[in-house]
């Protein structure tokens, strides 16, 4: 297939679309992202959260003022420990191309059999489930609460995580089977 100027036009690549991939692999997909919170003590905290696509179960992995590559890799180790027996089900982790996610972060996950899938640049829709949870957390909690410091932020995020994972009505027909 070519155009009048003799250049080849590309056709759509073979294989599933992004949405088909997400639906067919939901049981095996985790998604993570960082978000920031401004604290009343004048500092900014970075929060790393992971969500399971199939169950929408959220894990707030950590809060820090300085998210280094080593800290982020440690949060990956903590995630694997937290997943425990369920870690074998996870096959993919969707993340953005942020500089906080180093090769060590990816290596920790790869050792557990989890392949890192990078989002395209400026394509928040590729990580829409994580972005939606972060947006909900902001609207329902962070925009309505004065947060003094990191210990206070950790406490309210832990409470919100519990509320989200245990007390919210399941969506998309999912049940509490894996919560």
Residue ranges and their predicted role:
Residues 1-179:
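Charged DNA-binding/catalytic regions of mobile-element recombinases
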